[in-house]
């Protein structure tokens, strides 16, 4: 039986050593530069008491957050897939209408960082769950008003399985992902046209957990969504010149 998310979070706080620093102290009295330094490398940038810490990616002010709420303004419970270090998680939770964000992340080191930042900024709406999203039972987490899947789908070897699971727990799905161009098609897998992409492994914080992932074409991606009951798919942005490959932003709904 899966333990309640709040119970998992309490265990994570102990397991990942967040309590090694005395959080009873005011933030101003903690050597934040040292605490961030000993947890590096960081991808996400965090602004705390007017100072920047961590990496260079400003997830808290990422435009994809506003795009998500443009299409799902009434989402009060959100499942985030691929939380990284919690930047998007906290930004989603900052919206007044949001009551709960469950942020699933596959790397324990990223969860430790996210929980550390959470103790600093006091965002109590976010619950972090360690989950390999290639095989984790998302249904055990319950139902959600919307799923936020940004920067994750193109890292899994079976994206069709992940979308099927999302469709079982939410009628609304936001996706930002890379995809294969029609001129890049190498394989037809599970009835989907696309290509295999080599992943960097566990040592790369921006890589998937498996050795390779499958990138479907845009047409195959949309077919996956409609096949799983998402009757309306909004193409928000199609980035044809993204430095890391073709990328698309979609909002899919069963309504």
PLM-predicted stretches and their roles:
Residues 75-84:
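Conserved class I S-adenosyl-L-methionine
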Residues 107:
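Conserved SAM/SAH-binding beta-strand->alpha-helix loop
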Residues 135-141:
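Short conserved loop adjoining the S-adenosyl-L-methionine
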Residues 122-133:
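Conserved SAM-binding strand-loop segment of SAM-dependent methyltransferases
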Residues 148-149, 157-254:
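S-adenosyl-L-methionine-dependent methyltransferase catalytic module, highlighting the catalytic core
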Residues 85-97:
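Conserved SAM-binding loop of SAM-dependent methyltransferases across substrates and taxa
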Residues 56-74, 91:
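Conserved alpha-helix/loop element of class I SAM-dependent methyltransferases that forms part
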Residues 42-60:
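Class I SAM-dependent methyltransferase Rossmann-like catalytic core
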């Amino acid at each position: 039986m899966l333990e309640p998310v709040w119970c998992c979070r309490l265990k994570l706080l102990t397991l990942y050593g967040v309590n090694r620093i005395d959080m009873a102290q005011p933030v101003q009295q903690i050597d934040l530069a040292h605490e961030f330094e000993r947890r590096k490398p960081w991808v996400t940038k965090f602004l705390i008491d007017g100072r920047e810490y961590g990496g260079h990616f400003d997830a808290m002010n990422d435009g994809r957050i506003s795009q998500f709420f443009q299409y799902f303004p009434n989402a009060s419970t959100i499942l985030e897939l691929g939380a990284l270090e919690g930047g998007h998680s906290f930004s989603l939770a900052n919206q007044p209408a949001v009551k709960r964000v469950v942020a699933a992340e596959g790397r324990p080191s990223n969860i430790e960082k996210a929980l550390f930042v959470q103790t600093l900024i006091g965002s109590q709406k976010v619950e972090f769950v360690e989950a390999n999203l290639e095989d984790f039972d998302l249904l055990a987490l319950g139902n959600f008003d919307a799923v936020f899947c940004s920067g994750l789908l193109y890292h899994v070897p079976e994206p069709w399985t992940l979308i099927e699971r999302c469709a079982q727990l939410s009628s609304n799905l936001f996706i930002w992902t890379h995809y294969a161009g029609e001129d890049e098609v190498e394989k037809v897998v599970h009835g989907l046209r696309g290509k295999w992409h080599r992943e960097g492994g566990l040592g790369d914080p921006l890589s998937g957990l498996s050795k390779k992932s499958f990138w479907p074409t845009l047409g195959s991606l949309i077919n996956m969504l409609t096949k799983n009951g998402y009757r309306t798919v909004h193409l928000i942005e199609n980035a044809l010149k993204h430095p890391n490959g073709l990328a698309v932003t979609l909002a899919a709904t069963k309504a």
